Amino acid sequence: MNTSITARELFEQQRERLGLRWAAGKSGEKRELEAGNTVSRRPSLAGYLNAIYPNKVQILGTEELSWLDALEPRQRWETIEKIMQSHPLALVLTRNQACPEDLRAAADESGTPLWLSPKRGHELLNHLSYHLARTLAPRVILHGVFMEIYSIGVLITGEAGSGKSELALELLSRGHRLVADDAPEFTQIAPDVLDGTCPELLQDLLEVRGLGVLNVREMFGDTAVKKNKYLRLIVHLTKPMTEPTPHGYERLTGDSGTRHVLDLDVPLITLPVMPGRNLAVLTEAATRLHILRTKGIDPAAMFIARHSNLLERRTP
């Protein structure tokens, strides 16, 4: 998914938190920053004024304005022009400093958003850097039901009619929590972290065939829903094999693997759907098994080691 943010959106999202006010350049409120640009050019998303390697949001504190004031008039104007030509998403003056008239005029002329804030520079830098990094992070929507099971994020996937929603309903009745049904959105907020959330349209809702759309919060209470969760495991429901295969299902280690999501390989466990199988119990067991494996405990490997040792002892 391509992600972007406009100057107007950033202003509205951070206006209350940072006390932002427009000073000039309001005609540039539709100026846009796309995630693709941050990858190809690799600028800093937010930082103190830098005319050589410009940040996408330039912060001007007292030192930056003092530096501008120390320049000769011609050099000062050339520097301001260069700043505007770098096409920043916005300029922000800290501590509600008085905006220099030449800077205001250049912002209006070039359509560069210029804001004032009562916050100190480091506060602006921390908030804006985090917010922009989060907003522009790579994201993808996956089909399935995303739940919190035993405190870890588990995505239940499978073909239509495989019983994902019914399984989710059973897990809810067993005390686990729903994050999103049908279309959870995952954002890579760190090199090894996928954060899953629910689209606003689908919040608190679970669709079950024969019952329609259920409001999980109303049926099971506030504790049955979760705003977000990191994705740690995918449980895939599949139809049983109708024809024998050379290997069949792996009896010792189970059908385990990984699924590539954005830049991460997420652990995957496949569960065959068959009459009489308690999928809720199996999913809970799969989650517990994953937790054990993350701690370095692998029951299958332990059994194989025991078996090998036994054979070695009995071999003359």
Curated annotation (Swiss-Prot):
Cofactor(s) it depends on: Mg(2+)
Active site: residue positions: 143, 164, 182, 251
Molecular-function annotations in GO: ATP binding; magnesium ion binding; phosphorelay sensor kinase activity; protein serine/threonine kinase activity; protein serine/threonine/tyrosine kinase activity
Enzyme class: transferase
Record-listed ATP binding positions: 158-165
EC number: 2.7.11.-, 2.7.4.-
Keyword Magnesium: yes
Known catalytic reactions: [HPr protein]-L-serine + ATP = [HPr protein]-O-phospho-L-serine + ADP + H(+); [HPr protein]-O-phospho-L-serine + phosphate + H(+) = [HPr protein]-L-serine + diphosphate
Role played: Catalyzes the ATP- as well as the pyrophosphate-dependent phosphorylation of a specific serine residue in HPr, a phosphocarrier protein of the phosphoenolpyruvate-dependent sugar phosphotransferase system (PTS). HprK/P also catalyzes the pyrophosphate-producing, inorganic phosphate-dependent dephosphorylation (phosphorolysis) of seryl-phosphorylated HPr (P-Ser-HPr).
Sequence similarity: Belongs to the HPrK/P family.
Domain notes: The Walker A ATP-binding motif also binds Pi and PPi.
Subunit structure: Homohexamer.
NCBIfam families on file: hpr-ser (TIGR00679)
Miscellaneous comment text of the record: Both phosphorylation and phosphorolysis are carried out by the same active site and suggest a common mechanism for both reactions.
Protein name: HPr kinase/phosphorylase
Lineage of source species: Bacteria, Pseudomonadati, Pseudomonadota, Gammaproteobacteria, Lysobacterales
